[in-house]
């Protein structure tokens, strides 16, 4: 073990990697952030060829509820900041927290090799470095997942990751496949610029307005009293149907699930374009057919371009197979952090939950930093708890059975699981970073 310095390698300089570095710095643990691009930012850095960010992208959680620990976003910013503001905020945090002094920029991790006592990282230029711990913060939304569609298509097909601007849709008939938040955004862009815009939806979704009673939806939700999940679903369902109306009037399928059993859509604009006839809803695709698409209800429509807003595969390509937890694009890790069979490998950012990801990364980073500090009997106690893995991360939330939802958690349950681990370990409840 003496060959490996007491130092952590954080792979990835996006919000998760920066939150991780900040936590380690607080606990006095040496670290280095290894970032393949010339600057921090992760997915918000549009200079990266794998960034999924497009011109119209905004934060889908509010600035009030989304921030690095002790570093709120500026009060004069909009409730839902633009992508360039989030990049600016991320880099400002990195400067003020001293993360640039701990960075190895423009450095790709080609391979991470475990051995007894640590990790040897081989970089893209062939150089190597040794670390006691490896923390994967390389992001969950860059490795595009694109389904094979049956049939032949005369037009162009591309993943939403490669989309940049609504100008690309001018004069075209465009179909967006997938109704996640990015798919809904891009469908709205197409509704503004394309000759014809359509969105193919496999199922109906609940649409949550970005503002409720004049405040951001997450701010409104945080101010509500704690009630059982079933009651929250019932009350909010009634409220949404009253505010949004019958979705089938707009051609949308009625949701076949309760609220929060798959991701809701935080989008006000898509309903506007549907109501004005600028966007058309289509069912799931049956097959491609030359210059058109045939849908499962028998409808055929002509299109020039198809955008696959079909999500991302989780991966850490630098890990060896025997240490790589990702199977079929997802991983089931205790607390979405810990492999059961290694005490020197951790994951941060590979989690799906409602609400702010940046705030969640701060919580995950605190737990990882504490785990790195644990020695002797404390470490043994922690590893035994991780092996037991008796954390309930859903607390009665029944998710629709899809690949996307395999790793989806109930945010309240996740926070409760962190508190449970803190109590079990005797870690100070109010310890902040």
Show where each model-derived region lies.
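Flexible "cap/lid" subdomain of the alpha/beta-hydrolase fold that forms the substrate-access gate
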Residues: 58-62
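Non-catalytic, mobile gating and regulatory segments of ester bond hydrolases
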Residues: 158-161, 390, 394-396
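Flavin (primarily FAD) cofactor-binding/catalytic cores of flavoenzymes
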Residues: 2-56, 72-181, 188-205, 210-211, ...
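Short, surface-exposed amphipathic charged segments that create phosphate/polyanion-binding patches used
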Residues: 214
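The conserved 3'-phosphoadenosine-5'-phosphosulfate
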Residues: 378-394
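Active-site segment of extracytoplasmic enzymes that catalyze sulfate/phosphate-ester chemistry
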Residues: 65-66
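Basic, ligand-binding patches in group-transfer machinery
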Residues: 221
